[in-house]
Amino acid sequence: MTAVLTAPFIPIAKNLSSHRAAQGVIYADQLKQAGIDLYVNMSLDRYVEDHNTFDTMYVYHGNDWSGHLNLFGGLKEFPHVDNFLNFSKFKGKVYSLIIDFPDYYEQLKHKVDLANSKNKPIDPRWNQVDWNNIIRMQNEAETITPNLLKVYPNIAIGDSHAICMYRPEWINYSMPFKTLHGALKMGLHTFIKPCDHDFENVEFYFGNIDVRHHLLRQPDPVAATKELVREYTRQALGVAEMYNSTVTLYELLPIENEKRHIPKTGWYEKTPFYGSRVERDNIRRLFKEELKKYECSSLRVFEWVDGLINEHGELDFKYMEKPQSVHLSREFYPHWQGWEWNGLNPPINKPVKVHHASLESFI
């Protein structure tokens, strides 16, 4: 093993229910598809302290990098100082995934020096960080995009939920906070990076945010939903023709119980959602029914969520990321779960009770 994929601050969680870890593991799998043999440095028993065990490092900066560090607990109580300390000692070749290597030196070293000069309490391990080597890593790191390391015949595109669409031999583009309405204003075709080849399959998965926050704010939510789907399918058919491909549109996730805690990053207009659970689920089901009206040989609807619904008609918490937020746990992705990256064997499949819903409330 000569390469490692790691995160500089919070270690990649071994727990399959982590949305943040899932994106890192997907990058690892894409690197593997490109012929790179590597290990994902995870928490618990999957953690390798000496990063110099490896020759090459691929740095995952998280799926929510905003450009600024937010250390939970600050310099005094941040619980993962050891991980950054170990990270700082790596002497080999460094690749930065997706974004240019951030200037962690600039964002941290001054704060450490200032705290020391004022005798403010900090974790003493910050003073053991190899800051000169952090500068070297920043200056020498080469930025790469795993999606573009080889030519793939298939592409899946969507908002932050779209990472669940991943499987080997697929490009996977996930754009957090992107609504279907916003995607359509930009044009679905604009999300397919310029390529000199056609795609056999193109998939889109937008709309969950529209249902959660926007459609029920419209004067006529039913009419707004129908119009949104009409434009969605019109543009999807245009993509099918443009790339000589079959386009698949994903049905949306069921609605979870309203007691689910949603981090403020997922709020809009100071609320975690707009409309009751039943109202939003009615819109979700209408969305699916409208999608199916436009099915044809080049436009398909991927129906996949019935097994995630509990006896109350809700998206069951056990299928979701833990301990909070709105995404699925990787364990329940529809195509690929990547058990092997966690050193696990997939469980024997057990039948899941399917609950069918209706549109009675619209009749």
Predicted regions and their residues:
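Oxyanion-hole/transition-state-stabilizing segment in secreted/luminal serine hydrolases
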Residues: Y58-L71, I192-K226, L253-I262
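Active-site segments of SGNH/GDSL-like serine hydrolases
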Residues: Y95-Y105, Y205-D210, L237-E279, E303-N310
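Histidine-centered active-site loop/cap adjacent to the catalytic His
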Residues: Q128-T143, L291, L315-I363
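Substrate-gating cap/lid alpha-helix
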Residues: N257-E303, S325-H335
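Serine-esterase "nucleophile elbow" of acetyl-processing enzymes
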Residues: A3-A7, P11-Q33, Y105-N201
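Surface-exposed cleft-lining segments at the edges of enzyme active sites
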Residues: P11-S17, S66-G73, P176-K185, I209-R230, ...
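Extracellular serine-dependent O-acyl
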Residues: S96-I99, K120, S245-L253, N282-K318, ...
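Extended catalytic core of nucleotide-activated donor transferases of GT-like folds
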Residues: N41-N116, M137, T145
